[in-house]
């Protein structure tokens, strides 16, 4: 689950992480009032969307007086920002963060992530702050420094100081920077975050170490422990299909392709997307119906896939263990009949009750293409949508 920058900063403040004073605004008048309350000569008007790259897209402006605050707020509110993370459709700006300007002496990057390669939490830091960290990693990997964190001891002081030295934090601010990093790590752990990214972390002219931007994402599986985080959810920022899928406990992520995929099991779902790509297709989604899906759940999953107008065909790939193939078959047939399916449908079934499942599909009267293997199914659906 993602939250807005201003919400992330409020959480970090609770852990002693220093951030600029700011106010959220939903209208131009609220933006001007917020700037008045802050009482500084320079304010920053920042679009609040769940995506990076806002500055390059015109979503971050420095205002030197109240008239400029009004002008920039008018320009940004309601604007559709298109960044490298939003996709070509962009995101409409419905709220702003009005923040005190600060005297930036140097920008850095600090982030806490889950590293799949080591199976550990890793704190990363770089002197190349304010930039796309993926770009830095690709072009100048030697400029990114990492510390693997032992989950028992947590981030140690010496590790934080080592990172601060590595990225050339001024010597007199090393301890401040180390404290900042340790507070960031504690927030990451306490809130079950999946990423906590500060880009940029800045050193100011008056010797402060401050988070100028903050990105916090949270593990959806742990949200039951954090009703305070759930309350921060902004449904306007989420894909409607993903919201609908969550109501039925379906794991759905919209992608940019045209082949809908319905699979049971996250590993098989990823393998299915890979093999569709291998045969020249583009998956339209990741969709895991889980091991204990009911007919209703399968039917809803099918409907959600077909809400995507880009979908030109569907590949159902099921290995029945806990999930029974006849349940999947009934769900597919019911959904196809309800929505009067007129797009290619390839189904591969294996496992529990596979013969019964195939019988249900064969007797449905629907134009369903059977696949004998995952590769066979991927090849068939790719050829059918071309």
Curated annotation (Swiss-Prot):
Coiled coil: none annotated. Mg(2+) binds at residues 199, 213. Keywords: ATP-binding, Ligase, Magnesium, Metal-binding, Nucleotide-binding, Tricarboxylic acid cycle. Pathway: Carbohydrate metabolism; tricarboxylic acid cycle; succinate from succinyl-CoA (ligase route): step 1/1. It is an enzyme of class 6 (ligase). ATP binds at residues 46, 53-55, 99, 102, 107. One of its GO terms (cellular component) is succinate-CoA ligase complex. Substrate binds at residues 264, 321-323. GO terms for biological process: succinyl-CoA metabolic process; tricarboxylic acid cycle. Its EC number is 6.2.1.5. The keyword Transcription regulation does not apply. It catalyses: succinate + ATP + CoA = succinyl-CoA + ADP + phosphate; GTP + succinate + CoA = succinyl-CoA + GDP + phosphate. Binds 1 Mg(2+) ion per subunit. InterPro entries: ATP-grasp (IPR011761), ATP-grasp_succ-CoA_synth-type (IPR013650), ATP_grasp_subdomain_1 (IPR013815), Succ-CoA_synthase_bsu_CS (IPR017866), SUCC_ACL_C (IPR005811), Succ_CoA_ligase-like_bsu (IPR005809), Succinyl-CoA_synth-like (IPR016102). GO terms for molecular function: ATP binding; magnesium ion binding; succinate-CoA ligase (ADP-forming) activity; succinate-CoA ligase (GDP-forming) activity. Its cofactor is Mg(2+). Residues 9-244 form the ATP-grasp domain. Heterotetramer of two alpha and two beta subunits. NCBIfam families: PRK00696.1, sucCoAbeta. Belongs to the succinate/malate CoA ligase beta subunit family. Succinyl-CoA synthetase functions in the citric acid cycle (TCA), coupling the hydrolysis of succinyl-CoA to the synthesis of either ATP or GTP and thus represents the only step of substrate-level phosphorylation in the TCA. The beta subunit provides nucleotide specificity of the enzyme and binds the substrate succinate, while the binding sites for coenzyme A and phosphate are found in the alpha subunit. PANTHER family: SUCCINATE--COA LIGASE [GDP-FORMING] SUBUNIT BETA, MITOCHONDRIAL, SUCCINYL-COA SYNTHETASE BETA CHAIN. This is Succinate--CoA ligase [ADP-forming] subunit beta. It comes from Brevibacillus brevis (strain 47 / JCM 6285 / NBRC 100599). The gene is sucC.
